[in-house]
Amino acid sequence: MNSPVDPGARQALRKKPPERTPEDLNTIYSYLHGMEILSNLREHQLRLMSARARYERYSGNQVLFCSETIARCWYILLSGSVLVKGSMVLPPCSFGKQFGGKRGCDCLVLEPSEMIVVENAKDNEDSILQREIPARQSRRRFRKINYKGERQTITDDVEVNSYLSLPADLTKMHLTENPHPQVTHVSSSQSGCSIASDSGSSSLSDIYQATESEVGDVDLTRLPEGPVDSEDDEEEDEEIDRTDPLQGRDLVRECLEKEPADKTDDDIEQLLEFMHQLPAFANMTMSVRRELCSVMIFEVVEQAGAIILEDGQELDSWYVILNGTVEISHPDGKVENLFMGNSFGITPTLDKQYMHGIVRTKVDDCQFVCIAQQDYWRILNHVEKNTHKVEEEGEIVMVHEHRELDRSGTRKGHIVIKATPERLIMHLIEEHSIVDPTYIEDFLLTYRTFLESPLDVGIKLLEWFKIDSLRDKVTRIVLLWVNNHFNDFEGDPAMTRFLEEFEKNLEDTKMNGHLRLLNIACAAKAKWRQVVLQKASRESPLQFSLNGGSEKGFGIFVEGVEPGSKAADSGLKRGDQIMEVNGQNFENITFMKAVEILRNNTHLALTVKTNIFVFKELLFRTEQEKSGVPHIPKIAEKKSNRHSIQHVPGDIEQTSQEKGSKKVKANTVSGGRNKIRKILDKTRFSILPPKLFSDGGLSQSQDDSIVGTRHCRHSLAIMPIPGTLSSSSPDLLQPTTSMLDFSNPSDIPDQVIRVFKVDQQSCYIIISKDTTAKEVVFHAVHEFGLTGASDTYSLCEVSVTPEGVIKQRRLPDQFSKLADRIQLNGRYYLKNNMETETLCSDEDAQELVKESQLSMLQLSTIEVATQLSMRDFDLFRNIEPTEYIDDLFKLNSKTGNTHLKRFEDIVNQETFWVASEILTEANQLKRMKIIKHFIKIALHCRECKNFNSMFAIISGLNLASVARLRGTWEKLPSKYEKHLQDLQDIFDPSRNMAKYRNILSSQSMQPPIIPLFPVVKKDMTFLHEGNDSKVDGLVNFEKLRMISKEIRQVVRMTSANMDPAMMFRQRSLSQGSTNSNMLDVQGGAHKKRARRSSLLNAKKLYEDAQMARKVKQYLSSLDVETDEEKFQMMSLQWEPAYGTLTKNLSEKRSAKSSEMSPVPMRSAGQTTKAHLHQPHRVSQVLQVPAVNLHPIRKKGQTKDPALNTSLPQKVLGTTEEISGKKHTEDTISVASSLHSSPPASPQGSPHKGYTLIPSAKSDNLSDSSHSEISSRSSIVSNCSVDSMSAALQDERCSSQALAVPESTGALEKTEHASGIGDHSQHGPGWTLLKPSLIKCLAVSSSVSNEEISQEHIIIEAADSGRGSWTSCSSSSHDNFQSLPNPKSWDFLNSYRHTHLDDPIAEVEPTDSEPYSCSKSCSRTCGQCKGSLERKSWTSSSSLSDTYEPNYGTVKQRVLESTPAESSEGLDPKDATDPVYKTVTSSTEKGLIVYCVTSPKKDDRYREPPPTPPGYLGISLADLKEGPHTHLKPPDYSVAVQRSKMMHNSLSRLPPASLSSNLVACVPSKIVTQPQRHNLQPFHPKLGDVTDADSEADENEQVSAV
């Protein structure tokens, strides 16, 4: 055999690594560099491989590794072929990539093969498959464009430390509203991040490291989850906390910022991976893209509105948008918007060109790459010089392109760009250059897009086979076709005939080796088929003949079929193995029994499978027997010893060791049931299993030290490993097999069952899969110490139906797979056959029923993530590559794309599963626990590299109906919100999901991986729709090549199987999982917790397996609701809108008390918030946060407070009226990128006090748009009242302020965004905003000892939602009463310049008035600039309970205490906290502004917002601390008493009264205990109001306007 390996490279590879010279290493590197299968590796990786790889040659029929072998290396096949995991591997190909854990499958060398063996890295070594993270050596160079359009080139040296702190993608996208954690404002000159300070386009990691360290070290002991979590939860939390976040560096930006001369081949490859999906590069060849990437310059525009190109300006570059949006204003008035991936600028010519129109940025932080005119022209025109056109009869039939894959010159050649279908078929047998090594695979996958029938290719191949020089090439093509796409042949009679004819040609030409490989491939890839036959009577002939039987060691095979018979017409053919007949298993049945069954039935439903390989082995054995030639004896007569070529792992039956008449396991290729056993004899292609240990050979090692058999309250028995080999087997002594350390996993006792007695005592028995019931009885009798022979006992299964019916059955002696068969509602009992006692009492039956009823909170989050990932991965890996093509090109294939559709549906199913679980739980505390549970599951899915389920869970948590449950979310511990935020950050949609893609291609992301499937579909769809299928009448094969590459990358993610035993724990390899022998999950395996033993402890094994069974049963019986309207109704039922409050709130309070968290009662210092209410008719709306008025709620240092932002409100006309409207939903929490994120993009989470900004008016939205107020700071945002003219409307938002007489006091102006209906995309469950009208209400308050009572005024209760500025807690005990008495307004008017406790006025937007959140946020009093740590990207927040745990005595607030008393009432720690200081100011117009700034950098604050017009921001230096005597609050007691006199709503007030007397004040509720703890920020006077008032008010009707 001529070796394809370069002799020099082979000689160098044969040397031991320490003996290799630099010349040897360079020779090996050059050879590896030229291999296409290694083209994705960078130079440093190939250098490492050159030092570690070695050359090896293996003979045929040799076992390379077994399923139990620990993975320590991987292979590159250079010649020959191997069979692994049911697939034939042909050169050049790599296989066996796995890091740790057992192989999980066998690998057989089919013919003499050469391979390169690459050792896995040790713990202290760098992995070859991990990309290098070198210190940055080159200078960064990019251009900045300021607001005026002036360009500045930034060239600097970057410190290594600053670069190593960058997480994965890091551009701050304008659409992701506030991705950063908050820090105090730092000027650009003081910024610690060189990238942010230099470029001005913040990389989302600017402050990531600081917040990680600051928050991570904070004491979490005061968080409320402590009393809730169990010990297991705490240990699991520790594991979660120790988990390394999936953060990486922004490699793409690093490459972009390099000088063109500094860009390496690795940099260009990195840019190519990113750029090839942008529309601007569509229909360009790969060589053109490569050249463009090598010369592109990076540009950043920091501000929106910056002019990039003026009208009439000379053009000198071609621009491609990487991030942001630009607007081109043409001279004719036409406006054109361009988005990410679009291009503008010059055309490929050297002529002078001028800009027509003005190009300006629409958002902050726009990023571009630009290519100079000279380079652009040169590259695009150079393509013509590199192309070669093939003409026939004057027509172009093929276009080649000369391509260089790198600058080394070693990888260059011609590649087909486009051609006619005939020429593409012809090219199959032509020589393929090094730059196009996958042409055959690409063609066989994509031919279906331009050929009507595969037979067109088959006919040509049969013709070429007759030519001797082409025979080997044709055979390789057919082998690849069968191995990669066997579904093209199954079910297609024409292609089946082609395959039969090709086999006959191989036989005629004596190409037995190739024929054997073809048979193996067919057997490994074949799937079960259904054939239905009808016989006229039992005596009718079968029309086909049989062979085989278990007595021969084979299954039942079809030996011949009568031509033209019904059997032939039904698809039955020679070589088919019959797997089942009418549901009866035929895999291990005698020949006579099989014939009897077939003859005695007139209706035959056959399940068959093509297994020509084993069928020929059967014929060979039969011929040997007839000729009298002795054959190698079958090894033992154990079913478990029959090994065959199979494509799906499964179980192998094993009969009893004591069985006198032993049944022999058939040589089958059964799919899905039998374990893969491809062990072949060296001298003959037999299917005999090498087994090394003799009878009981391992039994002596099965002591307590090995399996952990220490008795724990229950007795324990271990089944001995049955002997399986006869010592007379001569073939076991052959060198090939005697060196193997092979054992059948089904023989390993790694499962545990629990057996009960009548008196309910139990013992644990460690068994294997094939242990029989009789053997279990024997050991159970021994363990229980029973007298009498084991024959007098039997094993019974007792089960209880949900209705309580007890079922009992005796199990047959040979019954096996006992651990897998037992259900949750069943038990195994040891029964005395001589007695008739009741095994399971009614009480025990009820206990069984209870145990079988599962709830989400009973399940282990690790186990749920494991089984979820296992289930999804099984679906994912079963997707045929052709299904992607059929789905993409909308082809009607015979096989269909059922697997693809099922996997596509997973995201929606799992998303609605999350919502169903949360919303079907009535108890609020349990709802919080379920949310916490799902966050843990998502974290574990991340470790399993199951991004699909992780995304689905995040999407479910952000559904509108879930996100609005404010009271539930506020109970969630802060650290889980941070965990959720970290998960959501992975799916940041900036730069085409760059962060997620960076993680996916990072060093730890080795298979198995379940990718985010919507992104996979999007990428393929872009490649399809962004490139023409035909160019100039020729098939665009460059497009097909790119699609094939994408599909190969997806399929490569399934190249290793998931091993549930290696994910998080050392548990049973087979128990509790559908496929036990699976490969390790690299990077996802937890170190075992100390309390879990790595030894096989019987009780622990049983508990783990029981949990796995519970999870499987739970997942299989899920009843998922998919109606979002029902979700909304359930959500409102648990946390209703305030418009639905009843007259008496005592029932609600009593219900809340049952849910009360065990957290200690809050003191007076732990205040909650007064919430303004904004009604909305629809269920999903976008809202703005309210400033927290009294945020001193000590829940722990890292507990992020619910955010409320006091917004200036706009007074509406008095003629507008709303009454009796029910508002079903509240506000949406913070908005991220509605423009570009996918519909379910989890850009932010539903968190307390966060709102969603309407994208239509959020162009200028920056960190100043929102603020988050620390729960530890004393912050008040109060405004006095003043008149504002309608002329003071905002220019951008066109909002109007109605004129109000000066006597009304302060008027806060609010602008409302109008762009809600403009959203082109929104997440699941989003609805459009329809702002309703409501009158402004006067509000004053009185608080009783029992709770904050109805002296509060409620606007018509809208479901304002979690964290919205209109929100109100359902458990805040705030009753609201309208104050119709104009005198109370008059009274308040006298305090126009006096400090008031709360916001003064509140209004709602009308349908006709725009609603601009960005401006209204900027007008917020006391607002600190800071991005929101938690964002909601799909749903509205709820008008739910603000703080459910706030119970107990609540003091009334009156105004009789002194300012000193007020300050004394503060908690000492909060009052004296030096971090935050409150600034109080009085302006000329009577507006009082309280701003909070911080003297040091903090993780929650970034910078204060710009001071709005009409407001005066006061710096700390200008202010003296202490009370301000000029700020005297009004005496509220008078207003309170007057408010009780009348119950008219404001709607009854005359217009003049309202227009002149509109003042609103909503005080915060304060939960108090002893009076000394009362917190009264900025209230100079405090007093008491009698409890009688509160009790009397409690039964009054809540009035809503």
Curated annotation (Swiss-Prot):
The modification Phosphoserine is found at residue 3. The modification N-acetylmethionine is found at residue 1. GO terms for cellular component: apical plasma membrane; centrosome; cytosol; endocytic vesicle; plasma membrane. The keyword Lyase does not apply. It is found in: Cytoplasm; Cell membrane. Keywords: Acetylation, Cell membrane, Cytoplasm, Guanine-nucleotide releasing factor, Membrane, Phosphoprotein. Residues 412-526 form the N-terminal Ras-GEF domain. Residues 860-1088 form the Ras-GEF domain. Residues 530-615 form the PDZ domain. Interacts with the second PDZ domain of human PTP1e. Guanine nucleotide exchange factor (GEF) for Rap1A, Rap2A and M-Ras GTPases. Does not interact with cAMP. This is Rap guanine nucleotide exchange factor 6. The gene is RAPGEF6.
